[in-house]
Amino acid sequence: MAKFIHCADLHLDSPFKSKSYLSPNIFEDVQKSAYESFKNIVDLALKQEVDFIIIAGDLFDSENRTLRAEVFLNEQFERLRKEQIFVYICHGNHDPLTSKITSQWPNNVSVFSNQVETYQAITKSGETIYIHGFSYQNDASYENKIR
């Protein structure tokens, strides 16, 4: 049986403008929370020896990504790669696919295009499974992708 983690809406680099009323120490902790959450997800994936992680939209808070976020993700994806854990990313309405995206992820990471795609995965137990998905091209999409 496939063993995986499904997550979404991590919103790395969110400015948390609505939380600016918090004390500086607490506000700093809130700003770190998305990074800590994703690190905890990776830690759990490694501990549970999952086959893959699906990130179903809004990994980033906007289409503009900071170097900090890219370096952090590369480090986390590399930890997963070393244990042969794959990552499938769908971009959401907050972080749509754009020509600005130049990230080069490790070879265990696949990013869905704006068309429905299917990836074939072989689990650690030898089972073949298919993962279907797509990424948002724009911050709003009303197109029915499943027909």
Predicted regions located by residue number:
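N-terminal active-site segment of His-dependent metallophosphoesterases
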Residues: M1-E70
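His/Asp/Glu-rich metal-coordinating catalytic cores
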Residues: F52, E63-R147
